[in-house]
Amino acid sequence: MSFYEIETPLIAKHNVGKALRAMKETIAEDKLPGYIVARYEDVKNDYRLMQDAMMRGLRDDKIDEVYADIMRKVYGAGLDVLIEEKVKKYSSFAYARVSAQQTEAHPDAVRTVLEAYVQDMAMMAFEPESTRKAKMEKLTADHHAYMKQLFNALLVAPMWNDRRAADFADLLLSPTIDRDDALLLVSAVMLATMNVNDPYKWDMLAEVYVRATDKVLKMRALVGWVLSLPYNPRGPRLFPFVQERIKAMLADKTTLKQMLDMQMQMLFCCNADADNEEIQRNIMPTLIKNTNLQMTRLGIVEKEDDPMKDIMDPNAAERDMEEMERKYRKMMDMQKQGSDIYFGGFSKMKTFPFFNDLCNWFAPFNAAHPALGAARERLAGSTFLNNLMENGPFCDSDKYSFALAIAQIMDRMPDNVKEMLNSDATLGPTVSKEEQENPAYICRSYLQSLYRFFRLYRSKRDFLNPFILDELEDNDGNALFMSYKLLACPEMEENAVALCGFLLKRKMMRELMSMAICYKSSQNPRLVRFLALVPMTDGKWQEAYDLFASVPEDQHTEESLRGMAHCCMSLKRFGEAVAIYRRLLAMHPDSFSYQLNLAVCLMSSDAFSSCGDASSCGDASSCGDASSSCGASSCDASSCDAAFSLGGKVEARPNKVVEEGTKLLYKLDYEHPNNANVRRVLAWCMMLQGNFDKAIDIYMRLLSQPDAVSADRLNAAYAHWLSRDVARAVALLREYCNLCEQEEAEAKEAAKKQGRRCEPTKSRNYRLVEDFTKDADLLSKYGISLTERKIMVDIVLNEEEF
């Protein structure tokens, strides 16, 4: 038995009896501490009293409240069981349990120690100069040892109650304790609550966030309560104050803005490996090539200038400097956008003994930290540590790494480099005081420290990792916290819109799908257009259309109309699509993409509404400005893939409508003679009309261009096949399959770098059968039977052995 077998009856069924029976079995199977058994006995006795009262025929008007209170007590006892499971399974929790036995974690006792430390530090000013340094170092070391034990004690602390949560909140907000102590304890409670979801500890973090006036404490508390939110939306029903607290916080616009910034920064952290690869491949080689320092066995020395270089190429130095500045600006731009540019370098510097202690990963940077004693000695007379603390552009974790690393190589540095340590230039671009007080910067810095812990700590698998986008293992979380149902409410919809745009821009379609599932009942037109991208990506056009249609007519935006028109084209509702594009052109008469789409719809309407699947060739919505709004991969009309079949009898076209479409199409070709999308549509229309030679001519010109796409080869193959040049069609189909496989490999590599699951690879057979099925109307119209399609697949695959 386990905690989850105790929790399930409570969360899913609200059944005390089943939960108590599960706990009884757990106690019988496992050797649990006496305090858990005692807690179980107390709850069991309370429940028996309720049963006895009912047996005697007594009625209690507050029976539901009493029953709910007993459920909460059982849940608390279950959390204690979960802690014991972690103590037995994970070394970090086992060590914390041993360490916790030496510390009293009651808030009153903690307050006494923390306030005494502040007072003792203040009294150091009155100590004689000769003894002050030694006494301060001892006081700091003793206090650090206490904080380490307290951190561990909070990690394995049993479930709190409302009184203890309130007392700890008051303590952490008190001006009479050191701020660094408060910051470290917030992290301890966060780590504990993430792994053992105590609603009272969570509420304490939320209370600190709401009441804190210190920006650093406030943002650390924000990260704390967000990352320790319960995944199961049913859980907070046992503790209504959780939902009430969330509702109250989400009513504040500042909180919403800070949550959105935090969510985006978490996704940037998740992309740290890809950013590091970009820096190592395209930026660092240039910066290293142009440095005048080199490492030798004797230390760092300056390289001598090459006298022949100025003679042979007098402009080389200037070009090198310009190139180095350009690469450096690119790296700084990445940082400004949110990229974690320092992770790659500092990830190699987390092997110092300092990082063996769990609490040190969460410690705010302090030059007086006991672990920096050797660094302070070696850097005596240098302002480096103070500059690092006050102006360093790194997160706290990296500041410790930098200080420890510099201290190690100090003796091997040339004198001029040692002198540089006294200037801010050593740290690269420093951070202004104003920027350091920006909540977004504070949050980003803290998240980067956390990311390093969850990626690099030696026992990282002991803890739930909130920086995972896919839940791959038991101890993985979900970095996309805004997809939690607990946060899905009208107040969050504007945040959801902004986040969906962010995800779409980075082609994170799986994460976009998670948001769609969370907000599937929304009628916000700006949000609906993003939610519809998920079924559109899977080719579920009717489902996407229904989402757009759910928006009240008077609330449609340009984006929702554009998406609805795309669905209509794919569903072969060309008449409806024509009406929508006319409406869009009334907004933007000169829009190229709207005119091109209208032309396609006009030439596809009425007599052609009974033809095959419509998708990308006819949809020019991906051309020009519309690409930013549609975005689903299957909606990429720029490829003009042959899945869009305008089939039907040519002579059945309504003359006036087709004439309008033809004129518009030739007008666009005249105005945009080099536009590939116009040429694709023209080629497709030529093929539909049986003008295969003209279609082939256009497709060959398209294939000769560097912006040709894989679907151009598929369409060109169709044109050759329909003109009975089968050999050329086979060659083009093989090229098409090769390109598709190359594109899939690149997409997989990109997904791997971002830590996301990859879509399954399509076999060549599957791909060709899928394409031929989509375009069956076109192929059948010109006499390509199902049998011929099967044979063509075998020819392309070269399957001669049977």
Predicted regions and their residues:
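Generic helix N-cap/helix-start motif at coil->alpha-helix transitions
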Residues: 1-3, 140-149, 177-186, 198-199, ...
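"A position-specific structural signal for the A-helix of alpha-solenoid helical repeats
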Residues: 5, 22-25, 38-42, 73, ...
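TPR/TPR-like (Sel1-like) alpha-helical repeat modules
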Residues: 210, 223-252, 718-744, 777
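Alpha-solenoid helical-repeat scaffolds
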Residues: 363-555, 559-566
